[in-house]
Regions:
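Short, Gly/Pro- and small/polar-rich lid/capping loops
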Residues: 1-5
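Accessory beta-strand-rich segments of carbohydrate-active enzymes
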Residues: 6-7, 12, 21-27, 60-187, ...
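Predominantly extracellular/luminal regions of secreted and cell-surface proteins
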Residues: 21-47
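N-terminal glycine-rich cofactor-binding segment
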Residues: 51-60
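Beta-strand-rich binding/interaction modules
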Residues: 100, 199-217
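Short, solvent-exposed loop/linker segments at the N-terminal edge
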Residues: 192-200
Length: 217
């Protein structure tokens, strides 16, 4: 379980929800042509979070199968200098690969779980940074839900379903940057045990931290 960050005296959050640039990769050439290295060509504005399928009055976009690209320029607050900076996506359906400027920082398979990466080495406080995301919505036997992609008589990819709902896709939940101190708690595990007579109980706990920390229970 990955807990959602909240603002605290030692953690600031910058939401990246809003309008992003969006492009279809109809020829599946974006990776080979390294689209993340410059502004997306022939892009249009799209709302994040949200399904790309329902944001345009175009059946070809609604039923599109393959890679799509999102991009946004983001300003890193000058006050974040000296802090650890993390880029987090709450959900990307069904596969996402992320670049910060020209650096690939993470990829994730699974459209319903969050993922994040420490991007401190790739950003400079007080300057802007380009975030690019390649999203793939194709279903296969390993995705949830499963499915397959077929090619119609016109050579166009088409989703084949084994379930009773539409394959909505895109950056489906919030995107954010957040800070932590350079010494931070990375994970907390708490396991409780209750005796059958309910008269005794014990608690096992484990804290994983980066750096030397003291923990008060």
């Amino acid at each position: 379980l990955m807990l959602r960050p909240i603002e605290t005296p030692t953690r600031e959050i910058k939401k990246l929800d809003g309008l992003w640039a969006f492009s279809l990769d109809r020829e599946n050439c974006g990776i080979d042509q390294r689209w993340w290295e410059s502004a997306l060509q022939e892009s249009r504005a799209i709302a994040v979070p949200g399904s790309f399928n329902d944001q345009f009055a175009d059946a070809d976009i609604r039923n599109y199968a393959g890679n799509v690209w999102y991009q946004r320029e983001v300003f890193i607050p000058k006050g974040w200098a000296g802090q650890r900076i993390v880029l987090r996506f709450d959900a990307v359906t069904h596969y996402g690969k992320v670049w910060v400027n020209n650096q690939e920082v993470m990829e994730h398979q699974g459209g319903y779980t969050p993922f994040e990466a420490d991007v401190t080495p790739y950003v400079i406080a007080g300057k802007s940074v380009r975030i690019t995301v390649c999203v793939n919505n194709e279903l296969n036997w390993q995705t949830i839900p499963p499915g397959m992609v077929i090619t119609d008589e016109n050579g166009k990819k088409k989703q084949s379903y084994f379930h009773d709902f539409f394959n909505y896709a895109g950056i489906h939940r919030s995107v954010m940057l957040y800070t932590t101190p350079n010494t931070w708690v990375d994970d907390i595990t708490v396991v409780t045990h209750v005796a059958q007579d309910c008269n005794h109980a014990s608690v096992d706990w484990q804290v994983v931290a980066n750096g030397d920390v003291s923990v008060e229970l």
